[in-house]
């Protein structure tokens, strides 16, 4: 067995579980997988997250890169493989389904300052920089065939253009819009929209506009010295490895784009992959280069030692690129 895999399996239960299914290709029915998953579900950290999420939608979101907000904790638990039927998950899903707009978008509570065109009040609304993440999480949690998911996906696709997703918000937010030109795609909205739709093959594989939107993100990488739509730069901070995947950075972009098979040999994508790869240490482990205060108690919330979760995430991306089961 590869030495990296041996090390990952010694890590937290969620890393062992994801390593076994994502890198080793083991089945959910395998005893080792089932054991790791059971151990994951009884960990205090996981129980605490599920308890917090039971109060969805929780406190108002005031900035979309708030890594401690329930929105990002929802994405995190869904990425771990937690799903319908696990203790506490059905209540979370019920709360999310109760907060879906008439047009299909899942809603959160947000508070937009009047300085940015908002009301300064807590409102149940949606924006294209949050609702795709809820759709993504719901699919990952095992709700893909639910009518609410079909409605949310149709709504999301309807807002896309040939070059991505613009800054669009619920009508209740009035004139609020991000700091960019109206005709520009929002890099972050485009990223998380693609992330959600990549989980639904019938959408991922059938819409030319989705394929062209993946190219938009690669063009932004090509033109990173000239273009910064909606103030999303792709410089030094963008290239720092950090997890959880909350904002617009190299790990998040690669995690999404490598889920589109037609891109895996694209030179622009490979350039980003190579920038990521050279950050490995001699053992092929990866260490966080930037951290998020809300996650400082987790093993990836420090910059001094290699992170199990970050190392897993990088090697999972590399496996998609090589197409090899080399573990």
PLM segments and residue spans:
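Preference for long, amphipathic alpha-helical scaffolds in soluble/luminal domains
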Residues: 1-327
């Amino acid at each position: 067995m590869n030495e990296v895999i041996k090390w990952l399996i010694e890590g937290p239960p969620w890393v062992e579980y994801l390593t076994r299914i994502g890198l080793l290709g083991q089945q959910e029915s395998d005893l080792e997988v089932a054991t790791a998953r059971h151990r994951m579900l009884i960990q205090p950290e996981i129980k605490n997250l599920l308890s917090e999420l039971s109060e969805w939608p929780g406190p108002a979101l005031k900035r979309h890169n708030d890594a401690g907000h329930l929105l990002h904790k929802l994405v995190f638990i869904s990425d771990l493989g937690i799903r319908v039927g696990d203790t506490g998950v059905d209540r979370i899903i019920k709360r999310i389904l109760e907060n879906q707009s008439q047009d299909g978008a899942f809603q959160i509570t947000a508070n937009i300052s009047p300085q940015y065109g908002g009301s300064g009040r807590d409102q149940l609304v949606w924006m294209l920089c949050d609702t795709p993440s809820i759709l993504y999480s719901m699919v990952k949690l095992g709700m893909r065939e639910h009518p609410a998911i079909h409605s949310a996906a149709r709504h999301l696709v309807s807002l896309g253009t040939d070059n991505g997703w613009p800054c669009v918000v619920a009508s209740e937010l009035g004139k609020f819009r991000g700091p960019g030109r109206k005709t520009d795609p929002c890099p972050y909205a485009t990223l998380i929209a693609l992330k959600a739709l990549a989980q639904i093959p019938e959408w991922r594989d059938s819409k030319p506009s989705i394929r062209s939107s993946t190219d938009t993100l690669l063009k932004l990488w090509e033109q990173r010295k000239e273009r910064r739509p909606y103030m999303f730069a792709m410089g030094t901070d963008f290239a720092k490895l950090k997890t959880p995947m909350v904002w617009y950075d190299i790990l998040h972009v690669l995690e999404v784009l490598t889920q589109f098979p037609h891109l895996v040999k694209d030179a622009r994508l490979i350039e980003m992959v190579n920038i990521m790869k050279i950050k490995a240490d001699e053992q092929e482990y990866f260490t966080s280069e930037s951290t998020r205060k809300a996650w400082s108690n987790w093993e990836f919330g420090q910059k001094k030692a290699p992170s199990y979760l970050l190392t897993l995430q990088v090697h999972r991306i590399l496996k998609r690129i090589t197409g090899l089961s080399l573990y």
